[in-house]
A protein has these predicted regions:
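Serine-esterase "nucleophile elbow" of acetyl-processing enzymes
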Residues: 1-56
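Alpha-helical cap/lid subdomain in secreted, periplasmic
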Residues: 27, 46-183
Length: 183
C-alpha cells in the first residue's frame, strides 16, 4: 500500500500581521494553522497554550506593544519577548522581526528607529538559541518609514508586503533546518 505523504505543517502565531496573511494562497503546499489575533502582542504569546510541537512555528508580534515601551523598560520587555518565543513548542521556530510602521503624518522616522533598536536587542538575545530569525525590516523600509507601496494603512501589509514575507519564509524553509539564508 502506498504511503500518503503529508503536507508539512506550519503554525503561525502572532498579531494582525499573522492573522491577515493569506497563508493558503502563499503556501498551498503546506498545512497552515493560523493563530494570529489582531491587536495582540507579548501577553498573547506568553499565554499561548496550543500544542504546536508537531509543527514548524512562525512567530511575529511586537508592533502593538511599542507604545508601552521606553528606555527604562525595554530590556525587561526583550527578556520576556525571548522567553515567550522560546516557550512556544515547535519542531523549529522562525521569528520575524518586529515590522516598521508609520504613525505620524509629519513623516517622522522615530518609531522605526526605536523598533530597529528593539529588533537588534531581541536578535542579540537570541544568539545561540534554536530560533531562526528572519530580519526583513530593511526590506520593508523606504526613507526610514514603512514603504507606502507595501502597506494598506501605514501599519498593515498589502499583497506586495506579504510577498516579501512569503519569499523570505519560503527560502528559509528550503534550507536545512537551523540555517537561515541571507534575506
Amino acid at each position: 500500500m502506498d504511503k500518503i505523504e503529508e503536507k508539512p505543517k506550519l503554525a503561525f502565531v502572532g498579531n494582525s500581521h499573522i492573522a491577515f496573511w493569506a497563508l493558503n494562497i502563499y503556501f498551498p503546499q503546506w498545512e497552515c494553522l493560523n493563530y494570529g489575533v489582531p491587536g495582540e502582542g507579548l501577553a498573547y504569546v506568553e499565554a499561548f497554550d496550543v500544542d504546536t510541537s508537531d509543527c514548524r512555528v512562525v512567530i511575529q508580534f511586537g508592533s502593538n506593544d511599542i507604545y508601552q515601551l521606553n528606555d527604562e523598560n525595554v530590556d525587561g520587555y526583550v527578556e520576556r519577548y525571548v522567553k515567550a518565543v522560546l516557550a512556544v513548542p515547535s519542531r523549529q521556530t522562525y521569528l520575524f522581526c518586529i515590522f516598521p510602521r508609520n504613525d505620524y503624518d509629519d513623516y517622522s522616522t522615530s518609531v522605526n528607529k526605536f523598533i530597529c533598536m528593539l529588533n537588534q536587542k531581541i536578535h542579540r538575545k537570541l544568539e545561540g538559541k534554536d530560533i531562526i530569525y528572519l530580519d526583513v525590516f530593511d526590506r520593508l523600509l523606504q526613507d526610514g518609514r514603512l514603504n507606502p507601496e507595501l502597506t494598506i494603512d501605514d501599519l498593515h501589509l498589502n499583497g506586495k508586503g506579504y510577498s516579501i514575507l512569503s519569499e523570505a519564509l519560503r527560502r528559509t524553509l528550503e534550507q536545512p533546518l537551523k540555517q537561515a539564508p541571507d534575506l
